[in-house]
Amino acid sequence: MLVEPVSGAPAAVADCGAERALVVADYHAGIEAGLRYERGVELRSDADGRRERLCALRDRVSPDCVVVLGDLVHRIGDPGEGEHDEVEALLDALAVPLTLVPGNHDGGVADAYDRIDVADAGGLRLGDVGFVHGHTWPDRAVLGAKTVCMGHEHPQVRLEDEVGGGRTERAWLRGRLRVAPFADHFGVASEALGWTTPELVVFPAFNDRSGGTWINVEGQSFLSPFLPDGLADDAEAYLLDGMRLGAYRRV
């Protein structure tokens, strides 16, 4: 498996050929300040906790680099002071190269941090693995990978017990991509894409305060322009502990 989830964590290890990458999505540094401004919600900063959790994963899997699938920061535009300090502290602590595939929240990152390798918005391909945030269509080169990793959706499942109680859990979503929506987007015949039916891996949000999309609840809509049409109907959901839930629409 080219992309192997880390058991019990919203992270995976990607085999990129020449190197192994620790991959996470939707870190949302500075989210507490954003929630205070956007919703009037007061939460104590978990900046230290986020950094420690990511560094613990680095120690656990010993990667050559870290890839963030977008939304490293929460504030759209130039990072605020607290957010900037959080990211600088993270870079100091990680001590391995960090690549960011920019998301819709990362507009000011390239100018603010010279220690981050910022990819193009259309994504990045390393070996047989492609990386995108998911808020825009992937580049064709990314779609040529065997496995494509994305964030943006913050997938969650709503689970209910026999007496009507319920809980929400972060989840992975994995399935094959359909060629038709991508051929339509690029304005070419399906054959012209050299389609190899790549697997899509939608990552749970690393930040547990960032909400999410209930992928198994009717009426909840996806955020990405190529979902759900670009994903096979038999795509499956998995919990962070690895439990396979089956086809995500029927969980």
Positions of the model-derived regions?
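Zn-dependent metallo-beta-lactamase
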Residues: 1-22, 249
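Glycine-rich phosphate-binding loop signature in dinucleotide/nucleotide-binding domains
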Residues: 16, 61-62, 142-144
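Active-site-proximal beta-strand elements of phosphoester/diester hydrolases
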Residues: 21-28, 128-135, 148-150, 201-204
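Core catalytic region of metal-dependent phosphoesterases/phosphodiesterases
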Residues: 22-27, 31-128
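Active-site environment of divalent metal-dependent phosphoester hydrolases
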Residues: 30-32, 74-76, 104-112, 137-141, ...
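Short, conserved loop/helix-junction motifs that constitute active-site signature segments
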Residues: 91-94, 141-144, 195-196
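A contiguous pocket-lining binding segment that forms or flanks enzyme active sites
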Residues: 115-185
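Acidic, His/Gly-rich catalytic cores of divalent-metal-dependent hydrolytic chemistry
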Residues: 160-251
